[in-house]
Regions:
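Beta-alpha junction/loop-to-helix N-cap segments that form part of ligand/metal-binding clefts
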Residues: 33, 46-53, 65-139, 207-214, ...
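Short, low-complexity disordered leader/linker segments with a strong preference
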Residues: 1-33, 386-388
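Hydrophobic alpha-helical segments within soluble ligand-binding/sensing domains
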Residues: 87, 148-172, 213-215, 238, ...
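Extracellular/periplasmic periplasmic-binding protein-like sensory domains
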Residues: 245-318, 330, 381-387
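Segments of small-molecule ligand-sensing domains
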Residues: 304-314, 325-379
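Extracytoplasmic "Venus flytrap"
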Residues: 27, 31-56, 78-85, 107-108, ...
Length: 388
């Protein structure tokens, strides 16, 4: 706690250009402490082992190679249950008790928005939060210590809905959304796409994080006789809504989800219920049997190391963590958050899961590509090439 308190109390002195001897919180001669908060007990818990293990795999590789600049990584994982209030408790422990150097790969739009400003104000790097980037950035007042990698949900939903309208000519469009940052931001993109076509929602229905019954929301769409349902959903909600559509025998409606619902875990858990689902997203959906040979080898190594099945979320968490490890390496022995931030701002990064080499433009991932996929025969199948 002492280093974190020193940072808070001396922030004004440092900002004034007066040198201090305080070291970075979470950094000792032999160790760098990283933290994250994930949904370990809530509606998205089934997908969290992939994110946690993907991170741990890359950190273990760095540690097995002797560490970075003489230091090894230690990862502390806390539960946010997809609830902002749980995230507040988690971040308090990570900052005060564990004194983490950085928060990496934290999950959830609402949980991240609830705590990001507290973290950066106390000098912790906040890297690659999984959630609504523009809302998280706004909450953090565009802090130089925040680096967002999740594409802007409004932008990608605008592109995805526009493509669906142009391709399938739906007469009526409905929107089912999670109340909070996720649904609000995705909804902005949906409304923009509809307005450009002279359209508006034929029906809309919200749900709360943690809800498991979506019969009333789907019934509202059915009553409005929509041709396309756009859903702002994560894992369980995506499957639940599709299951309701199938139960009604509603075969002539199309359903489009965004990045959080366009995942391999949705296929594993949803099975036949998600057949025909459309998804719009911004990274490649590799499987253990698809992709280039290095990716196949990575999946095989993951399966040897962990008990759960690997998916693209594990690979994505690994790729993000790899970027962070490289930035720590590039920052040098005298490690500070500012030096890591400078490295991230001035270098580019590549990985097979990304559609292109990535940079941080204004501390946000750039460029943002979008691809439309559909579940066919139990697998995500590309319908488009990556689009900007």
């Amino acid at each position: 706690m002492l280093k974190r308190l020193k940072h808070t109390l001396l922030a004004a002195v440092v900002a004034a250009g007066v040198a201090t001897g305080a070291g970075a919180a979470g950094v000792s001669d032999k160790e760098i402490v990283l933290g994250t908060h994930l949904d370990l007990s809530g509606p998205v818990a089934a997908g969290m082992p992939s994110i946690r293990n993907g991170m741990q795999m890359r950190l273990d590789e760095a540690n097995d190679a002797g560490g970075v600049n003489g230091r090894k990584f230690r990862l502390v994982v806390e539960d946010n249950g997809s609830q902002p209030q749980m995230a507040v408790r988690a971040i308090d422990k990570l900052l005060r008790k564990d004194e983490v150097f950085a928060i990496v790969n934290a999950f959830g739009s609402g949980p991240n928005a609830a705590v990001v400003k507290r973290a950066v104000d106390e000098g912790a790097l906040y890297f690659a939060p999984w959630g609504a980037s523009s809302i998280i950035r706004k909450t953090a007042a565009d802090s130089p210590l925040l680096f967002t990698t999740t594409p802007n949900y409004d932008t990608i939903m605008n592109t995805g809905v526009t493509w669906m309208i142009d391709s399938y000519k739906p007469a009526k469009v409905g929107y089912i959304y999670q109340e909070g940052p996720l649904g609000a931001l995705m909804g902005e993109g949906v409304k923009k796409a509809l307005a450009a076509k002279g359209m508006a929602y034929a029906a809309e229905a919200g749900y709360k994080a943690g809800d498991i019954d979506f019969s009333s929301q789907v019934a509202r769409m059915k009553a409005a006789d929509v041709d396309l349902i756009v859903i702002a959903t994560v894992t369980r909600e995506t499957i639940g809504i599709m299951a309701e559509v199938k139960k009604l025998g509603w075969n002539n409606v199309r359903v489009l989800t965004g990045n959080p619902g366009r995942t391999g875990i949705v296929l594993q858990l949803g099975k036949d219920n998600v057949e025909g689902l459309y998804g719009v997203g911004t990274w490649r959906l590799f499987t253990p049997t698809s992709g280039p040979e290095p990716v196949k080898a990575w999946f095989a190594n993951y399966k040897k190391k962990f008990t759960n099945e690997p998916d693209e979320n594990a690979l994505l968490a690994y790729a993000y963590t790899d970027m962070f490890v490289k930035a720590v390496q590039g920052a040098g022995k005298d490690l500070t958050a500012d030096k890591v931030a400078k490295y991230l701002q001035t270098n580019s990064f590549e990985h097979p899961i990304f559609y292109d080499r990535q940079t941080f433009k204004g501390n946000h991932f750039d460029p943002e590509y979008v691809e439309i996929d559909q579940v066919k025969g139990g697998a995500w199948t590309s319908l488009t090439k990556p689009m900007k």
